[in-house]
Amino acid sequence: MKTFCHFSLRLARRLPLLLLPAILLLLITTPPLAAMTLEEAMDALGEAKAQGQLGEQPDGYLGVVEDNSRAETIARLINEARREEYRRVARDNNIDLRDVELLAGQKAIERTPAGQYIRMPDGRWRRK
């Protein structure tokens, strides 16, 4: 029994070293998960909205209606781009950023087709 335990402890100590080649092989041969680009997010936006995953909000930004990582990534990338554009418009026109966001939100909600989600002022989502 002592021999078996001693052997097991030695193997347990060496196991990470024995697995290292297999782990390295996996790292080398597995392609990395590519991060979504803004262009890909913009291409995926229409489908995500049509599927009820994303919707327009009064603050000018996209909101996640149905939690999933893809929808969250699309919203994050597009919202970052929107925020940059809103800042530029506010700066160029010497107006408050919040005013630009609210106007953009109003226009986005007006342009949202029937059947897609919009966020109500009370925070609830509803189909337009």
Task: Give the label of every model feature segment.
Residues 1-11:
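N-terminal secretory signal peptides that target proteins for export/translocation
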Residues 10, 20, 32-33, 88:
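N-terminal cationic amphipathic segment used for targeting or macromolecule association
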Residues 2, 34-128:
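Anionic, Ser/Thr-rich low-complexity intrinsically disordered regions
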Residues 16-29:
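Bacterial N-terminal signal peptides
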Residues 14-15, 83:
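Hydrophobic alpha-helical segments, especially transmembrane helices
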